[in-house]
Structure formats: C-alpha cells, structure tokens
Swiss-Prot record:
Annotated binding of Mg(2+), by residue: S18
Entry similarity comment: Belongs to the shikimate kinase family.
Role: Catalyzes the specific phosphorylation of the 3-hydroxyl group of shikimic acid using ATP as a cosubstrate.
Alphabetical keyword list: Amino-acid biosynthesis, Aromatic amino acid biosynthesis, ATP-binding, Cytoplasm, Kinase, Magnesium, Metal-binding, Nucleotide-binding, Transferase
Subunit structure as annotated in this protein's UniProt entry: Monomer.
GO annotation, cellular component aspect: cytosol
Catalysed reactions listed for this entry: shikimate + ATP = 3-phosphoshikimate + ADP + H(+)
Disulfide bonds: none
Binding-site list for ATP: G14, A15, G16, K17, S18, T19, R120, Q157
Cofactor(s) for this UniProt protein: Mg(2+)
Cofactor annotation comment: Binds 1 Mg(2+) ion per subunit.
Protein name: Shikimate kinase
Organism: Haemophilus influenzae (strain ATCC 51907 / DSM 11121 / KW20 / Rd)
Length: 180
C-alpha cells in the first residue's frame, strides 16, 4: 500500500475544519489532530488566554512551531487555526508536506456558526464581529487559495457529504483506488 499522505484543512473559523477533519480521519483510518488543541494542551491554557497574555504575535510564534512539527508527521488529518496561513513558513510547511484542502465559507455562515462561541479571541471583544470576519476574510482568503490543492464550499453541505466529496477528490488526485 502506498504511504499515506497528510491532509491539511485550512479555512476561516466556523468553516467546519474540526468537525469535517474528525470524520475524514475516521473514514480514512488516519489520526486527527487540531493544531489549536495541541497548543492548548502543551501550554495548559486556552487560546484566548494565550492571546490575552502574549498577544496575537506570541500566539502565532507558538502556532508556527507546532505546525512545523505536526506537518512532519505521517498519515494525519490536521485542522489548522484560521490564522495559521498568515505565516509564510506555515504556508510553505502545509503546501510542501501534504494535500491542502481549503474549506470555504461565507462571512454570513461564519457569523451564524461562531455567534455563541466564546473561544474565538479575535471576536470576543469586537463591537462588530461581522465586520471583523469580513476584514479577516479579505486578508486570509487569498492565502487559503494560494496553498489549496482542493477548495470546497461548506455552507450548504453537511459534514458527512463533505467527507465523501473529499475522499473522492483525493482518490481522483492520486489516481489510486482509495489509497492515500
């Protein structure tokens, strides 16, 4: 059997990276890793607290080290934080070490999905969260597109359908009947 390639999920907060990633990993019999969860586990603090204490720059440095480490593993489905693509190094690690799937969503759908989530540091204290999401999209969406091998809109699909689409697309990319 061919060596399994890593699958890296990128996209904005609320796109469904963690939900889809878990199901995708299960279907492909791969390990699922969420880079934000690894950062929280290693620091013993949640992302919001790290942002408060170290600022976004401090968090991004931690994130870069973790993504460098995780992308060197084999046979994983990795869900990245929405801002991981801001680092050129992260974009290089992701695009060189696996298949990058951009889970695309609209600002409106993001707003609906993140409205009650208190673990989104960039939205927590925002007077106008929708505007923050629009501003982030302007900066980040071109970076997601830059490194994506596959782009999939997530607004109208449920996770199971998305997972099946991803598996089919990867199979077609590889030309291997189901082997990653």
């Amino acid at each position: 059997m061919a060596e399994k390639r890593n699958i890296f999920l990128v996209g904005p907060m609320g796109a469904g990276k963690s939900t889809i990633g878990r199901q995708l990993a299960q279907q492909l019999n791969m390990d699922f890793i969420d880079s934000d969860a690894v950062i929280e586990e290693r620091t013993g603090a949640d992302i919001s607290w790290i942002f408060d204490l170290e600022g976004e720059d401090g968090f991004r440095k931690r994130e870069e080290r973790i993504i460098n480490e995780l992308t060197q593993m084999q046979g994983i489905v990795l869900s990245t934080g929405g801002g991981a693509v801001l680092s050129k190094e992260n974009r290089n690690y992701l695009s060189a070490r696996g298949i990058v799937i951009y889970l695309e969503t609209t600002v409106e759908k993001q707003f609906q999905r993140t409205q009650r989530d208190k673990k989104r540091p960039l939205l927590q204290d925002a007077e106008n969260p929708r505007q923050v999401l629009e501003d982030l999209a302007k900066i980040r969406n071109p970076l997601y597109e830059e490194i994506a091998d596959i782009t999939l809109p997530t607004d109208e699909q449920n996770a199971k359908i998305m997972v099946n689409q991803i598996v089919d697309l990867i199979d077609n990319m590889n030309g291997l009947n189901g082997a990653l």
